[in-house]
Every structure is written in C-alpha cells, then in structure tokens.
Design a protein with these regions (language model features):
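Hydrophobic/aromatic-rich, well-ordered segments within soluble, folded domains that form packed cores
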Residues: 37-72
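Charged phosphate-binding loop/patch that engages nucleotide di/tri-phosphates or the phosphate backbone
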Residues: 125-151
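Short, conserved active-site entrance elements at the starts or edges of catalytic domains
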Residues: 17-34
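Mid-chain, well-packed structural core segment of small domains
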Residues: 77-122
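C-terminal end-helix/capping segment
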Residues: 68-87, 142-146, 150
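Residue-level detector of well-ordered alpha-helical segments, enriched
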Residues: 43-50, 87, 111-118, 130-134
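Residue-identity detector for glycine
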Residues: 3-5
Length: 151
C-alpha cells in the first residue's frame, strides 16, 4: 500500500490533472453559452460530454469516449480541480434552479440520460448534496444503474 505523498502518488495526481485539461480546453470555448442555455432552461448546443461527463463505457462515440471519466478517483479529481469542480457545481445548480419543467425539456434525449449518469457519478464521488438533489428532483431519487455498475 502506498503512503500519501509518495512520488508515485504525485506522478499519478499530476498525470490526472494534466488529463483533466481536456475538459478545461473544451469548456473554454462554450462556457458562457452553457450558462446562458441553462439559465434559459433548455440546452441548445453541443457541450454535454465535457460539462456533465459520465463514467467510461456509457457513451460510444469518439467524443463520448474522449470525455469519459475513467474512475471514481478521476471524478474526485474533477471535483477538486480549481476550474472544473466549481463549474460543475454551478451548472448543476443552474439546472436545479429551473422550475416547472421536466428534465426532458431542459435536456432532450439522450442528454437527459447523460445528465442522470453524470449526477450519479459525482454523487458517488462526494458527499456534497447538489448532485444527489439533481437526481432526486428530476429522476425520483433513482440513480443511473449503468453508472453504479461501472463504479
């Protein structure tokens, strides 16, 4: 068992942080639009994969594979990232702030399923309530079983 702070831990953490840069780069081009669409209560453009990522193995397109989260450890690192973590929380809260609409009005199929998968993943990566609140509100408090199986 490796101890905290060993050189191999440091390399792993650094490699994961560098790999997360793919999300930062993708979001940089669209984050203002993402916020506007979520505030309006309807996703209109293509950004789901890198704003609300899912666990590896759920998506089969090249884009889905590129932005898949490989493990619970990577999900935890995503949440701890100084840009990605706050953005994910903010975007999730914007979805939660939408009132009077079912999730299928906010995210058309299959993005409604991707959102559920993402919320399930991050609810397992942290005790923060915001992610669980999302699937409680929109999915009757039922997690995405495909995500849970892969964790």
């Amino acid at each position: 068992m490796r101890g905290a702070g060993t050189s191999s831990d440091h390399v792993t953490v650094n490699a994961m942080a560098e790999d997360l840069q793919r999300f930062v780069d993708a979001q940089a081009r669209v984050i203002d639009r993402v916020r506007a669409e979520l505030k309006a209560g309807a996703k209109q453009s293509h950004w789901m994969w890198f704003v609300f990522p899912q666990i590896k193995g759920l998506g089969h397109s090249e884009t889905a594979r590129r932005y898949a989260i490989a493990s619970l450890a990577e999900a935890t690192a995503y949440l701890a990232h100084p840009v990605l973590g706050p953005r994910l929380r903010e975007c999730t809260r914007l979805v939660l702030a939408t009132t009077g609409k079912p999730i299928t009005d906010i995210f058309a199929y299959p993005d409604d399923l991707k959102f559920r998968s993402s919320m399930t993943l991050f609810a397992h990566a942290t005790n923060e309530p915001v992610f669980r609140q999302a699937f409680e509100k929109f999915y009757g408090d039922v997690e995405d079983l495909e995500t849970v199986t892969r964790l």
